[in-house]
Amino acid sequence: MEQKNLDQIIRETVARYMKHSLIVAGNWKMNMTVREGMEFLEKLGPVDGKVMIFPPYTTLAVLAGEFRRRGITYGPQNFHYKDSGAYTGEISLPMIRELGCGCLLVGHSERRSYYNETDEEIHKKIQAALSEDFSVMLCIGENLDERKSGQWKKVLRKQLLEDLEGLSRDKIPYIQIAYEPIWRWTPCAPRS
């Protein structure tokens, strides 16, 4: 995909979504048991607007019906782009479909950092998810060094270009971009 075309698509997508209501998304990471997840949902109360939750696999499987009943979009924090195989610890798109998931989290900074997930792998996941009619929440972000050195725009552009390479224009509405400034969320970063 040409640089100019992708830039134009990104601008159009951002402009279109800015006209819509806000999306509130929560990644539960490796937190919340099924019981804790249910308690959280009870405290949350009725949902007004678009809410997305990405719980751990065990909680996802058990609370899928509760998420649906409350109108919450839900999905896994990770998945494999192949439908089956000897991939210990992974979950496939057919397995995810059985749970009624609507959106898949892709490219989270912890997946990129702790598991060395590359933009090439993220690209494969996005292509697989979109080909199976899932929507995707793509996480992009820069670390503190990239931020301080003024390279943050270059980093974000690279992630977008490589993660979305070759994507047809008709798939853009099925992608939400989540900007996660990694430097703000590390344990050492001051919180405000």
Regions found by a protein language model. Name each.
Residues E2-S192:
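Active-site loop-to-helix "anion-binding N-cap" substructures in soluble metabolic enzymes
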